[in-house]
Amino acid sequence: MHQQTLWLFSGIALVLVIATLISETLRWRARARPSAVLDNLVARIRAWWVMAAVVGIAFVFGRAGVIVLFALVSLFALREFITLTPTRRGDYYALLAAFYIVLPWQYGLVWTGWYGMYTLLIPVYAFLVLPILATIGGDTTRYLERTAKVQWGLMICVFCISHVPALLNLQIPGYAGRNLLLIAFLVIVVQSSDVLQYIWGKLAGRHLIAPKLSPSKTVEGFIGGVLSASLLGMALWWITPFAPWHAFGLALVANLMGFFGGLVMSAIKRDRGIKDWGHMIEGHGGVLDRLDSVCFAAPVFFHLIRYGWA
């Protein structure tokens, strides 16, 4: 593992240690009056420890570990999406193809580095073939809606997420062997934006930005969180091939995409009448609840780097 990666993970561990000490101290001091907010905070920090450990182990195994990790993440995310969007028996062949053919094929293409195919397989070929498979059962009830749900699930949960490990395929002059740090940069910046938006919203939030979609998101939280996380991205320029201002700009774009991606996924949840996509991650909900912002940020981040630096 590259020395910069070790320094980065050491910093993450230090932040988590401090957060753990603070949260456990607050909960101990409030032990006479149990607080659901503090309990949730402790659960979230413990979940962050697990997630950081899993990512760290994947990084130890390098390219193979990272691709396998995100393939599994896509599998769990797609399962959550399909489980909470009604399907019928007529969707059997389309779902079979989505889970057992398209998903592994997409990550196989990322593994081989075949850019021309992993950027087209799902938005072109799967987009056309899945409706054909859905017609085999002869079920036309809500046909367009059902087909669109499977297509959307593949786009969000497989196509978009696969662009995170696809960062390993970029050939950036003077940056050979360090592409894992691009993944770390993207995930840290976007996930930090989510946390900082929440903190800024609690501290200064006054005006709701989209009350029907996400009652907890405020204009102040959005501005403060996105800008703070973008400044964090600029501070992390040393792990990237970018100049500080380039790092800020890329972080800003990623954070904006992440924010609006979160709103889109919230709209889908409201449409389905659910609060969380799942319960896999304690304190965070499901995989999609934790990665909804990354889903929208990853493809844009990937292509900006590919056309600007690779």
Language-model features, listed with the residues they occupy:
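Interfacial loop-to-transmembrane junctions
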Residues: 272-293
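Transmembrane alpha-helical segments of integral membrane proteins
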Residues: 133, 261-276
